[in-house]
Every structure is written in structure tokens, then in C-alpha cells.
Amino acid sequence: NTNETKVRFTGETAKIGVSLEMLGRIFNGAGKPIDGGPEIIPEKKLDINGYPLNPVSRNPPNAFVQTGISTIDGTNTLVRGQKLPIFSGSGLPHNTLAAQIARQAKVRGEGEQFAVVFAAMGITNEEANYFMEEFKKPGALENAVVFINLANDPAIERIITPRLALTTAEYLAYEKDMHVLVVLTDMTNYCEALREIAAARNEVPGRRGYPGYMYTDLATLYERAGRVKGRKGTVTQIPILTMPHDDITHPIP
């Protein structure tokens, strides 16, 4: 009932409570547990938008992440702290690929801790059930944190989901010295949510109705990958998107 709905501004940005207890858990797109487990007792609360990172403080990527996919490991090697996008088409098995990478990725080296943060945005119930079953396989969820946003969830939640995932990854990487691989799928659904929210706010549309700040917004996500001087952990990203109508010239790709 919108007539009786009240909104109170707190003067603060959205935050997520983070803890090592998040490993092995599955959350919805708003960060609430959906695996039947208890609520997370947070060690601290972090701004989901992250914090400014001085480019000078970045270290160049130079170490290998093994995905277990021969075409990636052999010809498009994924390096810790790198962003490696996967462009897919409608009907292609990108969900299978995403689940396989999340399940079997690892880093080599003695004493190296590794974790996967998986964020699915705007997926169907069938796809969500597929991912849930994949992560329930033995050993798949042990070092993973999973966020699942469904297609029938609010669009604003779809905007929050990748930020929750990246904030969790930064916590594990920079405060717990872990090498974290973040898999984001499907970024096309994220951009569609951006367009929907921009239209609801009566903003001036850009190409094909997408907001003019879409690329800036995407940069706030992609630039959170990297290696930071003085920190052992790293954040590596694999964003996956389906090209609308298989068109590489579409604004999203």
C-alpha cells in the first residue's frame, strides 16, 4: 500500500555485515540467507559502494588463477587482480560455464587461501535451482559465497547484488588475505535494471534508452578488481553477459 508507506532517510549509504561465516552460504540479492541457515553475525559493516582506491596504490597483476577451463587457462589466462569478461549469446551455455568456473577455480602456491564470490542477477527460478544444485555438490560451496537475485525480484535489488558481492570479496581479500574470484552473471540483466530505474526517475535516456551514465556505473564495479600494495589478497573478476540479439555493437557489450 503506497499510500501508507513511509520512508525515513538515515543519511548513510547501504552497508552489508561481513564475516568469515559467509563462506559456504547462499544469500538472496539483498544479502539475506536463503539456504535455511542462521543469520550472519557480522564482524563489521562495510559500505557496499566500496572506497576510493588510488591508482598509484595498485600492483600490476602477475600471478595465475587456474579456472580448470582449458581454453581460458591456455589462451586467455586469468591473472589475479584482472578482469576477464565472457561475452555470450542467447541460448549458449554460459550458466554452465559460470558454475563450472566457480566450482573448480583455484590458485597454486603453499599457504595461499582462495575463495569464490558468485553473484547471479535477474535469473529465472530454473536457473537459480540449477546454480543451487551445482553449489550443493561436495566441496563446491566450502570456500564460496553465493548471491542470487531472481528476475521477479525488485530492479533496485539487482543494482545492489553485485555491490554486495564485491564488498564481500574486498573484505575477504584485503582483510583476510584471500585470493578472491568474483563471477558476475548476467551483466545484461544488471544494465536492464539500470535502464528501468532511470526511466522511472524520468532521466534523459541515452542510446536505446540506457542511461548516459551506464558506462560510468559499470566502471564502479569493474574497477574494484585488482591488487593493492601492502595487501596479500587480490580481487579477480569474471563478468559474464549475454549480448542482446547477439549484437556486439549493442550499448551493453
Curated annotation (Swiss-Prot):
Organism of this sequence: Methanothermococcus thermolithotrophicus (Methanococcus thermolithotrophicus)
Superkingdom, natural source: Archaea
One GO BP: ATP biosynthetic process
Keyword Transmembrane helix: no
Membrane topology of the entry: Peripheral membrane protein
UniProt cross-references to Gene3D superfamilies, sorted A to Z: 3.40.50.12240
Keyword annotations of the record: ATP synthesis, Cell membrane, Hydrogen ion transport, Ion transport, Membrane, Transport
Protein name: A-type ATP synthase subunit B
Pfam families reported in the protein's UniProt record: ATP-synt_ab
Stated family: Belongs to the ATPase alpha/beta chains family.
Locations listed in the record: Cell membrane
Gene: atpB
Lineage: Archaea, Methanobacteriati, Methanobacteriota, Methanomada group, Methanococci
GO cellular component: plasma membrane
UniProt subunit comment: Has multiple subunits with at least A(3), B(3), C, D, E, F, H, I and proteolipid K(x).
